[in-house]
């Protein structure tokens, strides 16, 4: 991680002009304010590791005041309320949570490991820690002929917490997956 941060620090825009600004002791006219951690869902990492990553980010980019990342609803369930508050204090905010849907039947079928009540519980905990979040919603995940019912179930749940965004996405189905076979069987 530290090597990636060093590389980003040097290559952010025009490395030559950035180097001159730094050597002349001038303030960067366009400092980095937000870092977004990529990968499947970095928020699943233990709090200690997330704090270590935040420390490195602030070391190499002291102007950063927001650290975002992808997350699952179950990630915050594995953290205490105090840990969530601590993570917010070091900059974690603006999480992108792949809730997928709030259709409990679809969540169970997809073996997501949570239900619509868990979405509400964990979002409330994030809000109490002042951590803002947005949702990724997978259209069509409720199955053949169930799209409207799934969308309505999701709307009922998604209208209760306060996501800054609900972004619809498509689901990628790989031929070697169980879901692909379900689709082939007309489900």
Model-predicted regions and their roles:
Residues 4-128, 132:
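Conserved SAM/AdoMet-binding glycine-rich loop
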Residues 94, 117-179:
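Conserved C-terminal portion of the radical SAM core fold
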Residues 180-187:
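C-terminal accessory regions of radical SAM enzymes
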